[in-house]
């Protein structure tokens, strides 16, 4: 069960609320809080991902701040592997490595603890987040995993905003899996 059928896709899509004109006019914001507070939808998603990734022999799940933490921590617990947060600059308390990425107007950075994978070179890491748009943050996250001597076995996203091209950008760095392409 590693591919959703059309009914399962629709079930998940129906559990995600669209907020028009947020955070600015013309944007259709995908609000996953409605999926998170629906125990059947959230449970189905985590069970589906657990089934998919059980065979990957993972060492860690890495989640991108902040919604990637929700899915990543739940999935890591079910898979009985470690969870590694990838955070915005200045949010992690110990020694970090950082990766810059471009925004519409400027740059931002994400960080990971330098010893996130407990110095186990080649740790098998799944990267997860709720959504991929332009791919800048996800691309930086894959590079961070590599810089910390991990191996990103796959990058997983619940939603892929296809027209923005981020999935293609990230798939050049790591295998990619998206559940819902919209």
UniProtKB/Swiss-Prot annotation:
<dbReference type="Pfam" id="PF00156">
    <property type="entry name" value="Pribosyltran"/>
</dbReference>
<dbReference type="GO" id="GO:0005737">
    <property type="term" value="C:cytoplasm"/>
</dbReference>
<protein>
    <recommendedName>
        <fullName>Adenine phosphoribosyltransferase</fullName>
        <ecNumber>2.4.2.7</ecNumber>
    </recommendedName>
</protein>
<comment type="function">
    <text>Catalyzes a salvage reaction resulting in the formation of AMP, that is energically less costly than de novo synthesis.</text>
</comment>
<dbReference type="GO" id="GO:0003999">
    <property type="term" value="F:adenine phosphoribosyltransferase activity"/>
</dbReference>
<dbReference type="GO" id="GO:0006166">
    <property type="term" value="P:purine ribonucleoside salvage"/>
</dbReference>
<dbReference type="GO" id="GO:0016208">
    <property type="term" value="F:AMP binding"/>
</dbReference>
<keyword id="KW-0808">Transferase</keyword>
<comment type="similarity">
    <text>Belongs to the purine/pyrimidine phosphoribosyltransferase family.</text>
</comment>
<dbReference type="InterPro" id="IPR000836">
    <property type="entry name" value="PRibTrfase_dom"/>
</dbReference>
<dbReference type="InterPro" id="IPR029057">
    <property type="entry name" value="PRTase-like"/>
</dbReference>
<dbReference type="InterPro" id="IPR050054">
    <property type="entry name" value="UPRTase/APRTase"/>
</dbReference>
<comment type="pathway">
    <text>Purine metabolism; AMP biosynthesis via salvage pathway; AMP from adenine: step 1/1.</text>
</comment>
<dbReference type="GO" id="GO:0044209">
    <property type="term" value="P:AMP salvage"/>
</dbReference>
<keyword id="KW-0660">Purine salvage</keyword>
<comment type="subunit">
    <text>Homodimer.</text>
</comment>
<dbReference type="InterPro" id="IPR005764">
    <property type="entry name" value="Ade_phspho_trans"/>
</dbReference>
<dbReference type="GO" id="GO:0006168">
    <property type="term" value="P:adenine salvage"/>
</dbReference>
<keyword id="KW-0963">Cytoplasm</keyword>
<keyword id="KW-0328">Glycosyltransferase</keyword>
<dbReference type="GO" id="GO:0002055">
    <property type="term" value="F:adenine binding"/>
</dbReference>
């Amino acid at each position: 069960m590693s591919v959703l059928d059309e009914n399962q896709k629709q079930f998940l899509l129906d559990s995600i609320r669209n907020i028009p004109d947020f955070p600015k006019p013309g944007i259709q914001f995908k609000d996953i809080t409605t999926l998170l507070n629906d125990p059947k939808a959230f449970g189905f998603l985590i069970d589906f991902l657990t089934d998919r990734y059980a065979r990957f022999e993972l060492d860690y799940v890495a989640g991108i701040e902040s919604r990637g933490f929700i899915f990543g921590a739940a999935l890591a617990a079910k898979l009985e592997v470690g969870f590694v947060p990838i955070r915005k600059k200045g949010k992690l308390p110990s020694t970090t490595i950082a990766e810059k990425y471009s925004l519409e107007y400027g740059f931002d950075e994400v960080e990971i603890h330098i010893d996130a994978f407990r110095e186990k070179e080649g740790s098998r890491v799944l990267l997860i987040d709720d959504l991929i748009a332009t791919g800048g943050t996800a691309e930086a996250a894959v590079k961070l995993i590599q810089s910390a001597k991990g191996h990103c076995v796959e990058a997983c996203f619940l939603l892929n905003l296809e027209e923005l091209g981020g999935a293609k950008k990230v798939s050049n760095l790591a295998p990619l899996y998206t559940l819902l392409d919209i």
